[in-house]
Amino acid sequence: MAESNPRFPRSIESLQAKLTDQSGSNRALLLMAPLLAFELLVFVVPFFILLRISLAEESSDLVYAEGTWTLEAYSSVLTSDLIWSIVGYSFLLGIVVTVLSVLLGLFYAYAIWRSTGLLKSLLLFSVVLPLLTTLVIRTYAFNPLLAPSGTLNELLLSLGLISSPIQFVPGTIGVVIGQLYIVLPYAVLAIYSVLATMDWHVVEAARDLGASRPRSVLEVVVPQAMPGVIVAAVISFAWSVGAYAAPDLLSGNITFAMQVEGLMLSDMRYPLAAAFSVLMLLLMLVSIAIMFTVLNRIGGEFELA
């Protein structure tokens, strides 16, 4: 009588497990196919078109001189003092708005997380409400509010807090306020979505062990909320560096997006505009990578403190 092979059932089980894993991978890839196709058509293909234009010679009749290859546009961008001053202003605006949006977003998200009932609904509604209006309308509304004879200056003068009107707009202060108003709701929602998954009893346990309120927030809440903080920082920074509406409506200073518009629509220098865009994209990716690393280290230091 033939002896049964004890390895045979195990081989069957192993094969079934492999087939199940492969089926799950294929299903996941199939579900991701529409998103991958969207990313390919909307981001990857346009980027390579942009890169091709940046490597071509300029043409007075066409977008670029077809069949030409040159690094002249990149040379012009890298040696232009005007371009680098615009880069510096755009990144400075992005850094200031990002710091303010993360700090204010963290406080506001924490307030929503700890509130209950009607107050919580009102706080959430006040975050979502600005998103129900168009970007241009809610940005342009800051002109009568922040003008030298606007509502804010009149209020400060009537309270005796200032002796003469403050020049908010046109100016960088007005741009920071307007851009902060644009990105703050997204920062709040990103941070709150993480805080909403936290267990408040962990914070209470830290306080029972002797941690003060500020220390329990810094060492328990902030490290746990760091994924939301990173998302808020990336959104705020990328949007603010490439901002167009707020700088255009509230300031006379030229930003990256405004300069690209001028090069394309007014000067018809598409290769130069494309090279400037590629350079800014690379600088933003490097900056976001540095910011991601720094925020992760800060979160780790708070957690280990």
Regions inferred by a protein language model and the residue ranges of each:
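A short amphipathic helical element positioned immediately N-terminal to and/or at the very start
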Residues: 18, 69-78
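Membrane-water interface segments at the C-terminal ends of transmembrane alpha-helices
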Residues: 27-60, 75-77, 81-165, 169-196, ...
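Coil-to-alpha-helix initiation sites in intrinsically disordered, low-complexity, charged segments
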Residues: 3-14, 68-72, 150, 212, ...
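Glycine/proline-centered hinge or cleavage motifs at structural transition points of membrane proteins
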Residues: 209-211, 223
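Glycine-rich helix-loop "coupling/hinge" segments at transmembrane-helix boundaries
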Residues: 61-67, 243-268, 303-305
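C-terminal transmembrane helix and the adjacent membrane-cytosol boundary/short C-terminal tail
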Residues: 2-14, 192-207, 274-305
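Cytosolic juxtamembrane amphipathic/interface segments immediately preceding
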Residues: 15-29, 33
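Hydrophobic positions on the alpha-helical face of helix-turn-helix-like DNA-binding modules
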Residues: 205-206, 216, 260
